[in-house]
């Protein structure tokens, strides 16, 4: 049982590296991609408009996306909170926010196998705490923040 657990952890780490490399190829650091996908101070955002911005990078319809109505600096501040286990039950670089923020969850309503420019979304708005995974900044990130959010692990 031990070797299989080790193999699955190695596979997960390789997959994470691949995702980070893909983000770099798109000209985005993981923290910049996090900000593009999840940070938006406009509490009245229109899902169809904002998701088109994200889908242009992906060239496909993303099924679900959560926007945090806070600043990137506030999300970085969450990285200073105590760390804990992430939802993958392996990584331990997740941090819970200490206050709730307004969020908008955009859920796809159109068929996913259509041109990404035609995706349609339904918003769901609420006020929740959130969890982010944080990593040391890359050389391409601002030196202002030594540790940055790279993944929205969930809301609660």
Curated annotation (Swiss-Prot):
SUPFAM superfamilies: RNase A-like. It comes from Mus musculus. Glycans are attached at residues 41, 89, 96, 107. Keywords: Disulfide bond, Endonuclease, Glycoprotein, Hydrolase, Nuclease, Signal. One of its GO terms (molecular function) is nucleic acid binding. Substrate binds at residues 62-66. CDD domains: RNase_A_canonical. The active site is at residues 38, 151. Residues 1-25 form the signal peptide. This is Eosinophil cationic-type ribonuclease 3. Belongs to the pancreatic ribonuclease family. InterPro entries: RNaseA, RNaseA-like_dom_sf, RNaseA_AS, RNaseA_domain. It comes from the Eukaryota. Disulfide bonds join 47-106, 61-119, 79-134, 86-94. The keyword Protein biosynthesis does not apply.
